[in-house]
């Protein structure tokens, strides 16, 4: 199975930019490509989905068994799978490699392209590259330099060859495709004006400065991943309503697919369009950025009332992140204005100015 992983030295080095550039370039070449994200990330897969026009998937070595990781990789792969890493290559749970990009590359036996941000560096970038290559046994095969000039790339490419790595190109500083930050790391793809134009511009830069042909060559991995196929039994005949729009868009594609494979009919509705909850046996309110649309959500009383009636009638409800905020009496928007919400949960919720908790957490039920 053809596959390649794009990893980074650290968060913010340009992994997502490079990944989207490569994905769009492959799509423009009419290649059937599928994309994956290492770890529990909703936002980066939405960028991938915007680029390739199909679902993007998560591979999480902390939450999944090795079998499940390789099963889902094989199940969802096209002619080539492009896997984007998370944080720095070796960064995992609680100062270990558990859940890290490195661990995923080992489990899936995938060749790795390391993205290095050269802003403020020239030759020092190679000390970083050499350190990553020699720190642990790994599958790092090539390097792409971000924020680098063409002149300096010639020197760095020679240095790469000296330590046995393939120089795969670079991206200059491209101001026209800057992706601004949000409180979870990146804005959602749907919030960026002219996103497809930006992605195609990235692809043009990739074709000019990145060796796409060599990436395809490296991806020709004849090492089969080992796994036991998961047997999924269709044993339910239920209808599950899922809030799905710009405000509620944080879902793992494989979770929804699994529910369908087990017999559930997934029916999506939009709180932003004031759609009522359809008749259902279960309700899912996913995460997102509802505080950006709090004024609209407050005005859409049809949805508010139907969600309240649904939950109060005893229909099981899973609400997380923004969906959990939506169930409260009051939600504070980005400008600290208060808006009335569903009211099932007493109290007010708001977004703080900084992350309160980030990463995995393990809990044990007391009852």
List each language-model region with its residue ranges:
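ATP-dependent carboxylate-amine ligase catalytic core
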Residues: 2-17, 23-108, 116-139, 150-154
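A short helix->loop->beta-strand "cap" motif at the edges of active sites that frequently abuts
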Residues: 110, 165, 312-316
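Internal gly/pro-rich beta-alpha loop/helix module
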Residues: 123-231
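Phosphate-binding active sites in nucleotide-utilizing proteins
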Residues: 238-301, 305-310
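Hydrophobic/aromatic ligand-binding patch that stacks against planar heteroaromatic rings
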Residues: 25, 103-104, 159, 258, ...
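A short, charged/proline- and glycine-enriched loop
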Residues: 1-2, 233-239
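Beta-strand->loop->alpha-helix junctions that form or flank phosphate-binding loops
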Residues: 37, 164-175, 265-272
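Cysteine-nucleophile active-site neighborhood
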Residues: 290-366
